[in-house]
């Protein structure tokens, strides 16, 4: 493998270019945004880890009047558009601010973090304090923001102030670039101070974007398009580019051509199929897209010998709480759809693009929309659809192996947590009393409460069996060597000197359950699973269990 510097976790365009990091050219984003009629406000939404921050850093470096960016962009696609470069490169005062990490368990701590981030950002503009054309009143507010003593009203109007001061100084209206605008609202929704943070963000957006005579245009990014009436009230000439939009569809994330080039440059063409299975599968507008964070993380790890096989990088960047809350909300209808998705199928749903964080969990439709818009699901391509869809509906699927693993891990954890809360005493009593009929009844009852994955293969039932005994004071072993073979699940009640041995079989039909049960018992006998326990346990109970979807049959040896 060739030694390349992959910019994992680096979203600063200038640092990537000057530091010699590997870069996939996405500067056509600039052409797309600046060609033709420019919207006063453009909102771009993409899932996390798809390059939004790097895209905004690229745009800011291109426009910033205080920089000389010609060398930074030399050799890139945008440099070939000489007319556009002459008109726009380093011609605009720029306000570039990211709301990333604006978080806190309380409103006070989150607001304090916001004020600190604003103070750091304003340090880059202290040259404005030396301009005699700017009023002392404006300079006073600027200094209070810098010193974190500004009133809340002054904080809400901070970008209005900054654009006005920049216009006075440069005699040009300013471009405002706001990255991850919805992070403070999302965190507030999770931590119980939604209305307070919404009030701050709505006022900040309104003062910056509405009737601001010092604003040339603005670009705002986030994960979700919050309903206009919630946060962008009164904003005129407002354009949104979501994952449904064809424009900018290749500007965030890697195309197949991008990945092919990366693998060629790295000398890793042999990894193409695995990378595609794990990190491809997103369909944005008209484009098929890979998650860029995953691809460069995998290539970096492969380069340094950290990982030779693909793994989930997404799950390490968030707690994936949206899936868990979705499962907790699940009724029978949602459960059936989740099982279809996790078995590799697709479901048809209406997608609501205009959401508010306080109503994300208010309906099944909203929950499916959030899973789609945040990248946990993707659209089935039109050419792959067997039938036409109702207006406003999309066929949704899990995009790749990485996201499927996240779903499976979350479902497994949900089952383990849920099982501890269920009344399992009747099931345990049936196990230790040798009552196979009662055990059949209790097992079936619990099966109907689960969300299956692996398309009802035996590994699902192994996980189910082990999970219902976990956290109940027993020692649970799964697929350890015993006797002359491998028993599926062993449950040891050491205090009472007893052990239960379970062998599970999957039946292809409901009618075949008895035969599958008999086969499980026969295997216990033939492979002598009980032999290892005769010296240490007084009671050894052996059960053959046969499963068919969410039905089971238990027989005792």
Regions found by a protein language model. Give the residues of each.
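P-loop NTPase motor core
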Residues: 9, 14, 64-127
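Amphipathic alpha-helical segments of the small helical/lid subdomains adjacent to P-loop NTPase cores
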Residues: 228-233, 241-300
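Walker A/P-loop-proximal flanking segment of P-loop NTPase domains
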Residues: 1-66, 70-81, 446
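Substrate-engagement module of ASCE P-loop NTPases
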Residues: 122, 158-169, 196-216, 529-532
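Conserved P-loop NTPase "ATPase switch" module shared by AAA+ and STAND
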Residues: 170-194
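Sensor-1/coupling segment of RecA-like P-loop NTPase cores
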Residues: 183, 193-234
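Extended alpha-helical interface modules used as scaffolds for assembling large macromolecular complexes
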Residues: 238, 290-528, 539, 553-557
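Conserved P-loop NTPase mechanochemical-coupling segment
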Residues: 8-17, 102, 109, 113-156, ...
């Amino acid at each position: 493998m060739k030694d390349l510097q992959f910019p994992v976790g680096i979203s600063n365009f200038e640092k990537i270019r000057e530091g010699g990091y590997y870069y996939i050219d996405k500067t056509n984003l600039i052409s797309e945004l600046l060609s033709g009629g420019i919207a006063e406000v453009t909102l771009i939404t993409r899932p996390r880890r798809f390059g939004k921050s790097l895209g905004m850093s690229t745009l800011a470096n291109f426009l910033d009047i205080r920089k000389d960016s010609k060398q930074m962009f030399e050799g890139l696609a945008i440099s070939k558009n000489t007319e556009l470069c002459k008109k726009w490169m380093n011609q605009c005062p720029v306000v570039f601010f990211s709301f990333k990490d604006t978080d806190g368990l309380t409103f006070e701590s989150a607001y304090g973090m916001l004020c600190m981030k604003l103070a750091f950002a304003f340090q880059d503009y202290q040259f404005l304090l030396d301009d005699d054309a700017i009023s002392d009143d404006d300079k006073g507010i600027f200094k209070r923001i810098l010193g974190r003593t500004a009133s809340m009203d002054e904080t809400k109007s901070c970008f209005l102030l900054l654009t006005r001061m920049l216009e006075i100084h440069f005699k040009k209206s300013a471009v405002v670039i706001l990255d991850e605008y919805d992070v403070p609202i999302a965190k507030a929704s999770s931590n119980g101070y939604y209305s307070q943070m919404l009030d701050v963000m709505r006022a900040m957006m309104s003062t910056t974007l509405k009737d601001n005579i010092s604003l040339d245009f603005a670009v705002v990014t986030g994960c979700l398009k919050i309903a206009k009436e919630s946060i962008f009230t009164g904003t005129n000439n407002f354009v949104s580019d979501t994952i449904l939009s064809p424009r900018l569809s290749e500007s965030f994330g890697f195309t197949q051509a991008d990945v092919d080039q990366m693998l060629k440059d790295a000398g890793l063409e042999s990894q193409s199929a695995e990378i595609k299975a794990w990190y491809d599968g997103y369909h944005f507008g008209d484009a098929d897209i890979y998650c860029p964070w995953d691809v460069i993380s995998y290539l970096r790890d492969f380069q340094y010998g950290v990982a030779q096989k693909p793994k989930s990088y997404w799950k390490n960047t968030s707690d994936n709480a949206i899936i868990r809350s979705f499962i907790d909300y699940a009724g029978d209808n949602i459960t059936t759809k989740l099982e279809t998705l996790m078995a590799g199928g697709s479901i048809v749903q209406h997608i609501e693009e205009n959401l508010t964080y306080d109503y994300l969990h208010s309906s099944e439709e909203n929950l499916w929309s959030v899973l789609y818009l945040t990248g946990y699901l993707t659209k089935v391509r039109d050419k792959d659809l067997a039938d036409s869809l109702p207006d406003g509906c999309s066929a949704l699927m899990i995009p790749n192996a990485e996201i499927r693993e996240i779903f499976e891990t979350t479902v497994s954890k949900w089952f383990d947590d849920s099982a501890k809360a269920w009344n399992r005493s009747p099931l345990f009593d049936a196990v230790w009393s040798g009552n196979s009929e009662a055990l059949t009844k209790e097992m079936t009852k619990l099966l109907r409460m689960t969300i299956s994955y692996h398309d009802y293969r035996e590994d699902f039932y192994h996980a189910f069996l082990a999970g219902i005994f976990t956290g109940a004071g027993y020692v649970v072993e799964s697929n350890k060597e015993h006797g002359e073979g491998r028993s599926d699940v062993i449950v040891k009640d050491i205090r009472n000197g007893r052990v239960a041995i379970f062998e599970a079989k999957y039946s292809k039909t409901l009618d075949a359950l008895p035969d599958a049960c008999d086969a499980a018992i026969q295997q216990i006998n033939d492979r002598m699973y009980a032999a290892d326990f005769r010296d240490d346990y007084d009671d050894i109970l052996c059960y053959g269990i046969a499963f068919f979807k969410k039905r089971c049959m238990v027989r005792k040896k």
